Amino acid sequence: MTDHKPSKSLPKATAKRLPQYYRLFKSLVEENVTRTNSQLISEKIGVDAATIRRDFSLFGELGRRGYGYETKVLRDFFGELLGQDQETHIALIGVGNLGRALLHYQFQDRNKMRITQAYDISGNPLVGTQTDDGIPIYNISDLEKNVKKSDIKTAILSVRKENAQEVVDTLVKAGIKGFLNFAPIRLKVPSDVVVQSIDLTKELQTLLFFMNDNKQ
């Protein structure tokens, strides 16, 4: 297989499918399946075979015509792309209802992503305590100081949209390079900082649209 890493111009839609590919090949290896093809991959993840082949072509030769794809090779390839072997420590900002759920969320087995710090305003009674898993919940006034002293480069935002930009500005100064943002606002960040936003209201509205469209 050609050793080929994606360029920064990798289409966003393709990038969003990378975790699907990794989970599928990981599952196939665990099921002792050694080889597969684009049609079988399509049936497993609900993406058409032509799109899968086009995605894979962006990385060089991941398989061979008439032979297919070796599951272990592609599991390792996509795992490396997604940093599965890297220990990733994450700061969570906002310990309201959603934040508490995220604190207790168990990332997939053998995944090395961990929330190691959480923050909220002083009025939250959880500030100054820690979770059953030992995650400390700090006052947000300590945010910049603590993050600067840590190895954390990734943050999850679960704050009100009115406060989101101010929090992001503080975290960027502290060295954060990536945000998973649940606030319904477009954040302004430097060009070397990545933001992935999840708007739950928008996602539900899209779901309802497709549900209503199916009725017609």
Swiss-Prot record:
NAD(+) binds at residues 94-99. Its main location: cytoplasm. GO terms for biological process: negative regulation of DNA-templated transcription; response to redox state. Keywords: Cytoplasm, DNA-binding, NAD, Repressor, Transcription, Transcription regulation. GO terms for molecular function: DNA binding; DNA-binding transcription factor activity. Gene3D superfamilies: NAD(P)-binding Rossmann-like Domain, Winged helix-like DNA-binding domain superfamily/Winged helix DNA-binding domain. It comes from the Bacteria. GO terms for cellular component: cytoplasm. It is found in: Cytoplasm. Residues 20-59 bind DNA. InterPro entries: CoA-bd, NAD(P)-bd_dom_sf, Rex_DNA-bd_C_dom, Tscrpt_rep_Rex, WH-like_DNA-bd_sf, WH_DNA-bd_sf. Belongs to the transcriptional regulatory Rex family. HAMAP family: Rex. Modulates transcription in response to changes in cellular NADH/NAD(+) redox state. Homodimer. This is Redox-sensing transcriptional repressor Rex. It comes from Lactococcus lactis subsp. cremoris (strain SK11). The lineage of its organism: Bacteria, Bacillati, Bacillota, Bacilli, Lactobacillales.
